[in-house]
Amino acid sequence: RTIRQMGDFDVICLQEVAVNFPGLPGSRGEDQVAELSAGLPGHTVIYGAATDVPDGRGGRSQFGNAIFSRLPVGQAWRHLLPWPADPDVPSMQRVLVEAVVTADVGALRVMTTHLEYYSLRQREIQVDAIRHLHAEACAMSGRAPLAEEQGGAFEVFPRPAEAILCGDMNFPATAPARSQILAPF
């Protein structure tokens, strides 16, 4: 309801989306992906769970990010971000969800993530990983598909260099990590 009150969006990027996770503050264990999908008819959902653990009752509890798109969605990826050990702070696995959407201006990659909060070291490594993923996508955008990549699991779909990164970066605008993620290649 809140999203609809804010406006009529073609693409919505969300973080901290839970499925069957009653242990989270404010959660009843609901399937937030299903509830959001029901409230956003006509949108394709791309969900990426960073955390996927047993719920203790024979099911699974998941926590991650989601992209909801009213625009046509091509290929989608769910990239687990690095999670190196940092014994001095609590931390959790993080994910970047990426989808190619077709807008009036052409194909565009939309990415959403939620970087580590407590560990500066992990967050900096995650920023490096996102930059690496973007560089990889830019390289793929200029590559012509091979004949063997037509149809089936090897099919190469358009993956444009143009991208928008959304999310909870867990750093202020003045942080070095912001300059790091925005630095030109």
Please report, for each region that a protein language model flagged, where it lies by residue:
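Active-site regions of metal-assisted phosphoester/phosphodiester hydrolases
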Residues: 1-11, 28, 44, 48-185
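Active-site phosphate/pyrophosphate- and oxyanion-stabilizing loops and adjacent acidic/basic residues
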Residues: 34-35, 179
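Membrane-embedded segments
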Residues: 20-32
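Short, conserved active-site loops that position catalytic residues or coordinate cofactors/metal ions
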Residues: 7-21
